[in-house]
UniProtKB/Swiss-Prot annotation:
Name of the gene encoding the protein in the UniProt record: PMAIP1
Protein species of origin: Canis lupus familiaris (Dog)
Subunit structure: Interacts with MCL1. Interacts with BCL2A1. Interacts with BAX. Interacts with BCL2L10.
Name the record gives this protein: Phorbol-12-myristate-13-acetate-induced protein 1
Keyword set includes Mitochondrion: yes
Domain notes: The BH3 motif is essential for pro-apoptotic activity.
Pfam family, one: PMAIP1
Origin organism lineage: Eukaryota, Metazoa, Chordata, Craniata, Vertebrata
Length: 54
């Protein structure tokens, strides 16, 4: 595209052991799951508070 600068080639970082990648992936998935769980609990609480009559 005109006006865009060419992207510099990224230099590869140091290779990491597969175990490190698995641990990092597991941590990220856990954080993501915790956020979703918190949101669901919050929505359930709000729906109980604002539900009319029951």
């Amino acid at each position: 595209m005109p006006g865009r600068k060419a992207r510099k080639s990224a230099q590869p970082g140091p290779t990491r052991a597969p175990e490190e990648l698995e641990v990092e992936c597991a941590i990220q998935l856990r954080k993501f799951g915790d956020k979703l769980n918190f949101r669901q609990k919050l929505l359930n609480l709000l729906s109980k508070l604002f539900r009319s009559g029951t």
